[in-house]
């Protein structure tokens, strides 16, 4: 076997709050990390935007830093894999490469009213059947329609082929390739409300409903294969970009959930629980999403997904919004300083509720406070809310799949919180397993890229590389679990339908 000890795969991980570049070796081990935060823009309540040009410059900077700071030359990089925040929508000029507007982030709720109008008009079923998604402001399609409706002349320019639309993967691939590649993979395309997941192509009927010209859309390519070539001016040599997947699909691949019925939960800004359902899409009867995991070697793998909007973002809100903590790391010790939540429940519906409720008009609320409530109780309620939301999703997932989960693999920043992971295992009643390499999103992108160029031979090799760091066994009595769920669901019920559609 060829000695590849001095060769690496570079993973570009463009997330909601930060952009990173991570170097992976043959054993799936990390050889270098560079990171830069991304500015969040909140122009109106419920609106969330990013500067697409800032994202590009940050991604380029961290890619260069990962190589430079670790003494790695461009010729040692056999492939680049990319993973990205999904649904976030960019519209740019094909000639200048300049964005026409700040990117509309997946958390943005400005099109909730439009989604209501489309639902009232009877279109929700068609979107659901074709795309596997619920008709919600979360996804890219209505965001793109908003941009075309509100930027003067944009729709006519789009019809003339002067503009390009893309999720963040498309935008960065365009920039990295010097404008030569306008592409996306099925995992990202399946999050737009514009993509037929059964035929794996853009859907003309859905495009017509949203008045979106086909000329805007990127070409569909495999998640693992010959995608684009990164121009030599960026990293010092031409390098193949051979792997792309949306962040949650990439994390599922990085967790090596490659067999039917395996599932993972990523605790990032939001929480995202995905289950592998094999080579055929599984329609959900419990308000989950059917989505494409990845496409390689002519085969498409499908997933069931439940999306929680406020995961780690709940902790950020405690820090930045309320000032209860000065750093996110403080929450575990603060929450552990009390024996339980003291009857306090936080429903973090700050941007509505995702699966399985899908209520864009729910709003955040605290219940059960007394004169004895302390900041520690609120901190604990915030952590527990992350686990409660994830448990709601898993219960719906088990009903859809007709089988119980044997274990849940976990990753993301909050997965390092032992108190949260133990509470999650207690609520679910199944073991929660944290891997040694928790950077599974970037690892999944690296695996997809490396498989395409032979750096790793096959999926069996990836399975052999996966190692557990810690296994959290459930220890909560069933009557206690049931009582906690009953109170949680009472709290959720009171937070629903709070805001007005206008």
UniProtKB/Swiss-Prot annotation:
Q: How is its activity regulated?
A: Inhibited by fructose 1,6-bisphosphate (FBP).
Q: Pathway, per UniProt?
A: Polyol metabolism; glycerol degradation via glycerol kinase pathway; sn-glycerol 3-phosphate from glycerol: step 1/1
A GO MF label: ATP binding
InterPro entries found in the cross-reference section: ATPase_NBD, Carb_kinase_FGGY, Carb_kinase_FGGY_CS, FGGY_C, FGGY_N, Glycerol_kin
Family label: Belongs to the FGGY kinase family.
Keyword ATP-binding assigned to the entry: answer is yes
Catalysed conversion reaction: glycerol + ATP = sn-glycerol 3-phosphate + ADP + H(+)
The family database entries (Gene3D superfamilies) matched by this protein are listed as:
3.30.420.40
Give residues annotated as binding glycerol.
86-87, 138, 247-248
State which Enzyme Commission number(s) the record gives: 2.7.1.30
Q: Which residues bind ATP?
A: 16-18, 269, 312, 316, 413
CC annotations in GO? cytosol
Pfam families (UniProt xref) = FGGY_C, FGGY_N
* Residues annotated to bind sn-glycerol 3-phosphate: 16, 86-87, 138, 247
GO terms under biological process: glycerol catabolic process; glycerol metabolic process; glycerol-3-phosphate metabolic process
In the UniProt record, what gene is named as encoding this protein? glpK
**What PROSITE patterns is this protein classified in?**
FGGY_KINASES_1, FGGY_KINASES_2
The protein's name in its UniProt record:
Glycerol kinase
- Keywords, alphabetical: ATP-binding, Glycerol metabolism, Kinase, Nucleotide-binding, Transferase
Write down the top EC class of this protein. Answer: transferase
Purpose = Key enzyme in the regulation of glycerol uptake and metabolism. Catalyzes the phosphorylation of glycerol to yield sn-glycerol 3-phosphate.
Name the positions where ADP binds.
16, 20, 269, 312, 413, 417
The highest taxon in the source lineage is: Bacteria
């Amino acid at each position: 076997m060829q000695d590849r000890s001095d060769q690496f795969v570079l993973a570009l991980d463009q997330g909601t709050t930060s952009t990173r570049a991570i170097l992976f070796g043959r054993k799936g081990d990390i050889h270098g990390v560079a990171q830069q935060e991304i500015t969040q823009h909140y122009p109106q309540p419920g609106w969330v935007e990013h500067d697409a040009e800032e994202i590009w410059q940050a991604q380029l900077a961290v890619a260069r830093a990962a190589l430079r700071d670790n003494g790695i030359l461009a010729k040692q990089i056999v492939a680049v894999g990319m993973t990205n925040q999904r649904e976030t929508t960019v519209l740019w000029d094909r000639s200048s490469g300049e964005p026409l507007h700040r990117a509309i982030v997946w958390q943005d709720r400005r099109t909730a009213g439009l989604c209501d109008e489309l639902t009232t008009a009877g279109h929700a079923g068609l979107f659901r059947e074709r795309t596997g998604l619920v008709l919600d402001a979360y996804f890219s399609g209505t965001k793109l329609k908003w941009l075309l409706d509100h930027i003067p002349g944009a729709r006519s320019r789009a019809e003339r082929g002067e503009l390009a639309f893309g999720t963040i993967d498309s935008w960065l691939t365009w920039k990295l390739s010097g404008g030569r590649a306008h592409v996306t993979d099925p995992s990202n395309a399946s999050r737009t409300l514009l993509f037929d997941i059964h035929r794996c192509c853009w859907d003309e009927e859905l495009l017509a409903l949203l008045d979106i010209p086909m000329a805007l859309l990127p070409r569909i390519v495999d998640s693992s294969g010959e995608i684009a070539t990164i121009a030599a001016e960026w990293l010092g040599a031409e390098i193949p970009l051979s792997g792309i997947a949306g962040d949650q699909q990439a994390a599922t691949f990085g967790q090596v959930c490659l067999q039917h019925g395996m599932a993972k939960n990523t605790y990032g800004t939001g929480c995202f629980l995905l289950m592998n359902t094999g080579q055929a899409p599984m329609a959900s009867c419990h308000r989950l999403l059917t989505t494409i995991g990845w496409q390689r070697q002519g085969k498409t793998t499908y997933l069931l997904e439940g999306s929680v909007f406020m995961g780690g973002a709940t902790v950020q809100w405690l820090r930045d919004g309320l000032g209860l903590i000065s750093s996110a790391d403080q929450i575990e010790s603060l929450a552990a300083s009390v024996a339980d939540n003291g009857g306090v429940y936080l429903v973090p519906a700050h941007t509505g509720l995702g699966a399985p409720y899908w209520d864009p008009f729910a709003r955040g609320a605290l219940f059960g406070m007394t004169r004895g409530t302390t900041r520690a109780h609120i901190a604990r309620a915030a952590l527990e809310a992350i686990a409660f939301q994830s448990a709601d999703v898993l219960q719906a997932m088990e009903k859809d799949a007709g089988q119980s989960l044997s274990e849940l693999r976990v990753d993301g920043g909050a997965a390092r919180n032992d108190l949260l992971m133990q509470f999650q295992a207690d609520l679910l009643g199944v073991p929660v397993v944290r891997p040694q390499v928790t950077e599974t999103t970037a690892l999944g992108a690296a695996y997809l890229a490396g498989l395409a160029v032979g750096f790793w031979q096959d999926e069996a090799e990836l399975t052999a590389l996966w190692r557990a760091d810690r296994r959290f066994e459930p220890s909560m009595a069933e009557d206690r679990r049931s009582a906690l769920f009953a109170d949680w669901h009472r709290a959720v019920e009171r937070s629903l339908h709070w805001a007005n559609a206008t």
